[in-house]
Regions:
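Metal-centered catalytic cores of metalloenzymes
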Residues: 301
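Charged, compositionally biased N-terminal leader segments and the immediate start
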Residues: 2-68
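Short, hydrophobic beta-strand segments that form beta-sheet elements in well-ordered domains
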Residues: 107-109
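N-terminal start-of-chain detector that recognizes signal peptides
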Residues: 37-41, 45-48, 101, 232-233, ...
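Alpha/beta enzyme core
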Residues: 53-69, 73, 77-102, 112-259, ...
Length: 315
């Protein structure tokens, strides 16, 4: 099944053949969607979902699902091999200590630790996620981004998270944004690639929707809210807009795109709210730990504590 980019490229070629002056590829892709959304209408929609739907998802079954959707993350300047290995070993022990609970969906760290994680992880079904492409700023040469991504995959990464070139996006260089994402997706091949939008830096709902669509159009397998390194990370409003973009893209193309809220998920209720928004906007098809991921460190112990009914700091 082709992407929007494939379809638009064919349309452009046909128009050129008859001498029609056309919009650029990215303009044609965006023109198929309604980008005239306001922050006020998004906030109203989110408030309604929270008021009417969240309570029905605040239960043990949903919390177990959320635990199984976590990408257990360490992305600190002070990370060491010992710290990363300790995180891996906790995941290795989890099944024996909590046999009735789902293990986390993935471990997420910098790519210099990938081989260590790949060599020491013993649990089937847990992905190794790497942030590449000069995370968190994305401000470097494209060649550096491609080499880092290729090395991460060579060492055993099974998911790649990159940051959209936010500066290019804010300056209106949508072609540059798409070219970068597409180039890195070509490096990833069959390895799923998440594109981090850094929604807190984009300014408004319309910009978040535009960035979401451009990223999917350029090859993202998932879109992700944030690096967790900026002042504003994931919010219910940004997740709602991203879900709307995913739904519209899916309705037009039949291509399912995953979602990963990350950064600032500080409470179990935060996670329940995100899950509820996904359920209401995208539906049950997205409520698997393949299509829905959460990037977090602190939330994992909070979820586990609520599930077992006593405070624990296992992770």
């Amino acid at each position: 099944m082709g992407t929007i980019k494939d379809t638009v490229s064919k349309d452009i070629q046909a128009q050129k053949a008859v001498g029609i002056v056309e919009k650029s590829e990215y303009e044609q892709a965006l023109s198929q969607y309604n980008l005239n959304i306001t922050d006020e209408e998004v906030k109203a929609a989110v408030t309604k979902i929270i008021a009417e739907k969240v309570s029905e998802n605040d239960n043990l079954e949903v919390k177990k699902f959320l635990l199984g959707s976590v990408e257990l993350t360490t992305l600190s300047t002070t990370d060491t091999e010992e710290k990363v290995l300790e995180m891996v070993e906790k995941v290795n022990r989890f099944d024996s200590e909590y046999p009735d609970l789902p293990h986390v969906a993935a471990l997420c760290a910098y790519p210099c630790f990938t081989k260590l994680m790949a060599d020491s992880l013993e649990v089937d079904g847990v992905d190794i996620t790497n942030v590449t492409g000069n995370f968190p700023s994305s401000q470097t040469f494209l060649e550096v981004k491609t080499i880092e991504t290729a090395l991460a995959i060579k060492d055993g990464a099974t998911h790649i998270d990159i940051v959209m070139p936010v500066g290019k996006f804010l300056s209106g260089d949508y072609e540059g944004v798409c070219d970068t994402i597409n180039e890195l997706k070509q490096v990833c091949g069959d390895v799923p690639m998440k594109v981090i939008l850094e929604t807190g830096d984009l300014g408004n709902a319309s910009a978040i929707k535009t960035a979401s669509l451009l990223s999917m159009y350029a090859g993202a397998d998932y879109i992700k809210t944030s690096t967790g390194k900026e002042k504003i990370s994931a919010t219910p409003e940004s997740v709602y807009v991203m879900c709307q973009a995913i739904k519209e893209y899916y309705d037009k193309t039949g291509i399912q795109i995953g979602l990963k809220p990350a950064g600032g998920i500080n409470t179990v209720m935060d996670a329940v709210i995100y899950c509820t928004i996904v359920k209401e906007v995208l539906g049950e098809k997205w409520l698997t730990n393949y299509w829905f991921r959460m990037g977090t460190s602190r939330l994992t112990n909070l979820l586990l504590s609520e599930i077992i009914g006593t405070e624990t700091k296992f992770f």
